[in-house]
Amino acid sequence: MKKMLRNAPLLVLAAIIAALVAASGLGSKTKADDYSDQKTPAPAWSLMDLAGKEIRSDQLKGKVVVLDFWATWCGPCRMEIPGYIELQKKYADQGLTIVCVSLDQQGPGVVQRFVAQSGINYPIVMGDQKIVEAFGGVEGIPTTFIIDRDGNIREKKVGAMPTAQFEKLLKPVLE
């Protein structure tokens, strides 16, 4: 019992440090890779949207594309949706197109129901193993790529990110 009481201050200190790290975001799982100094061409892709219409990467040349790998069951992915809706409205006239690649295994019906309830204002395409591999494998979801008007990857982030922080990554690519 005395040993436990002697260690109590250390346990309290460890708990406080853990809480501070979590609150500061240092423990966040979001990872962003800056490609801005590189010319890394985004892979070409072609996928079907929820209406069965083909969407191809070459149709988006000249636009800034946010390509987000996600799933309806992913909590962090769902948390980012209101921000993406806001960014699509705010920057559409500057050439922004958000395209979300659903990795849901249950098929488009599940995704269609989710989209109808959430008010998403950007295209959703159904992903497959081919696009995941083309983008170097998806370490986790959400995984998001910012692709510039010339088709080069400028940013990659893994994990959820607050809208304001993501907008700071996006704005230089839109300019």
Predicted ranges, named:
Residues 2-12:
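N-terminal Sec-pathway targeting helices
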Residues 11-22:
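Hydrophobic membrane-insertion alpha-helices, especially the h-region
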Residues 27-58:
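N-terminal "domain-start" segment that seeds a small globular fold
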Residues 64-65, 96, 142:
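Alpha/beta-hydrolase fold active-site loops
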Residues 66-68, 100-102, 145-146:
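Hydrophobic beta-strand core positions in alpha/beta domains
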Residues 78-118, 127-134:
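Structural microenvironment flanking redox-active thiols in thiol-disulfide oxidoreductases
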